[in-house]
Amino acid sequence: MAASGESGTSGGGGSTEEAFMTFYSEVKQIEKRDSVLTSKNQIERLTRPGSSYFNLNPFEVLQIDPEVTDEEIKKRFRQLSILVHPDKNQDDADRAQKAFEAVDKAYKLLLDQEQKKRALDVIQAGKEYVEHTVKERKKQLKKEGKPTIVEEDDPELFKQAVYKQTMKLFAELEIKRKEREAKEMHERKRQREEEIEAQEKAKREREWQKNFEESRDGRVDSWRNFQANTKGKKEKKNRTFLRPPKVKMEQRE
């Protein structure tokens, strides 16, 4: 009975210890999560070198899982926007403004269901790529007769791999978007230059035609004046040199 009692106490103690460790682990996770919920840390995170690419993932900006509800997204936005608002961080207003803009942009993007779906598709593509890569590596290890153990078997390392691949995909899409915009802008500029050139050409042609018509009218008037003057001179000349007929003197016998 004593042995049984000791065993029960031991078992109960083990269960209590496991519960305590679970509770302690949860507390540490909460402390870790809350440790970044300071204005300074959030501004630093959102404006660190490379943030222009890190912040392309709206879920990463708001530090939320892709599966969260719209209500949780709104709650997180309010929380972060207050932390990084420039009015609250006047000693670091410029960076606070950049951080606030990143949070605001991510929030608005996730409110748009179409853009949210695109972001989710990128994240899913990153996850599928890592899963495929891990599968191929395991297949190769098995073929070589080696243990089929890879780093990504660790859930945390798998998560990190997905994060890196997802960030890479977001960056590639952003680069392509900028290239497409630059190309479109160049095309619009080229078309505008052609329109301006066509307008200037048409203007030059109109001016030439106008000048030609005016000069033609002038030439016609000059020719008419010339003809009139010439005719007048001829008539005057004819009148000047007109000689009366000779009168034959009558001879008397």
From Swiss-Prot:
Phosphoserine modifications at: 35, 222
Organism: Homo sapiens (Human)
Domain J, chain residue ranges per copy: 57-124
Secretion signal span: none
Residue(s) carrying N-acetylalanine: 2
Function noted in UniProt: Suppresses polyglutamine (polyQ) aggregation of ATXN3 in neuronal cells.
Subcellular location, record wording: Nucleus
Protein name: DnaJ homolog subfamily C member 8
Region (Disordered): 181-253
InterPro entries hit by this protein: DnaJ_domain, DNAJC8, J_dom_sf
